[in-house]
Amino acid sequence: MKILLVGESSLLHNTLKKGLVELGHQVTLMSDGNDWHNSPRDIDLRRNMERYGRWSGLMVLWKIVCNLHKICGNDIVQVHNYQFVPLMGWWNMLIFWFIKFTNKRIIKGCFADDPHLFRQQAKGIPAYSDTFWNGKLQNIEENKERMAFHFMPQFDKCWHTVSYHSDALIACLYEYYL
């Protein structure tokens, strides 16, 4: 089976790739290396701000274009959450649709923060989470920027698009079992 893993979350896709390769599958991992983890990847999408500055996003797109032969024609593609490429939300939506139409199945991994998760936590679901425990909201001031980022209209729309149009959702964190 030909598999593409897009994005990274604490070496989750890297570990998954190792297991799938041992089972005989052909796996390509495309990510930015998950920031400071700098995890191994086949297609490097890291933004080099020092070298390219504000043009670094174009370099990410160029790397994607140069690797279309690896990105298209997969049996399964799993994307890491809704922002799986280090670009703005609308670029992630465009790339999502391209991946969806050029591959057989696309799976969204629920591996990190997203607007839905924060909305549920604000309601107290589940009873314990990063931002809610002991019956009340916690760490709101510390998480204000993090939450504001995910509630930006472009990212909220991107989350809806990727979540509702994926063929399946895979939950990793206990918060997703709501």
Give the location of each predicted region.
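N-terminal subdomain of nucleotide-sugar transferases
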Residues: 1-43, 102-103, 166
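Short catalytic/ligand-binding loop motif for oxyanion handling, primarily in non-cytosolic enzymes
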Residues: 12-14, 36-39, 85-88, 114-119, ...
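Short, solvent-exposed beta-strand-terminating loops
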Residues: 30-39, 108-130
